[in-house]
Amino acid sequence: MSRSVGSLASCYAIGLMALWAGVAQADQGPGAQDQGADQFQGVAPQVSGIPTCFDTNHVVLEINNIQVEYWKTTTPNQFHSRAHVRGPVVRIYNDHSGHNHISVQIGRTADVAIELIYNQEFGALPDLAVGAEVETCGDYITSTAQSGGYPASPDGAIVHWVHRSTRPGHESGYVAISGVVYGY
């Protein structure tokens, strides 16, 4: 069964990449070379000064926007994994209980977004504006329904633990806003 799910995930990701690459080519006109498609192909170059993101097995985790988008639409509430996403801020939610809540676009349109939850105990974030470029590494959770005391995310999924780890055996995360790293 996992083999067929993996195959389905691969087909879905390949289809998204083809769609996005085609849209990017169309946006630039015939014969144009796509300069920004790497953001949507699951692998992107690291910006200097930004830490390496690791999965739960301490393997380098490249930008995985496509995988995260797939998880959002196919996994049950409270599914957990690691995410390393990059995109522009599309909404800024009210801060509460010492956390910033930021909606970051991970797909081709603003409605394909994930809620980034940043713990202010690891330092203040700058004043944010819609359009600011964000890269983040942390724990992904599908959040489509309330779980315990936590409400569902307005984006249907979250990335949290986006700061240095205070727990042995748990990978660190971070938030980079316009190339400046926070929480690490």
What role is predicted for each listed range?
Residues 1-12:
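Bacterial N-terminal signal peptides that target proteins for export
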Residues 11-20:
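Bacterial N-terminal signal peptides
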Residues 22-26:
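Sec/Tat signal peptide C-region and signal peptidase I cleavage site
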Residues 27-184:
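OB-fold and OB-like single-stranded nucleic-acid-recognition modules
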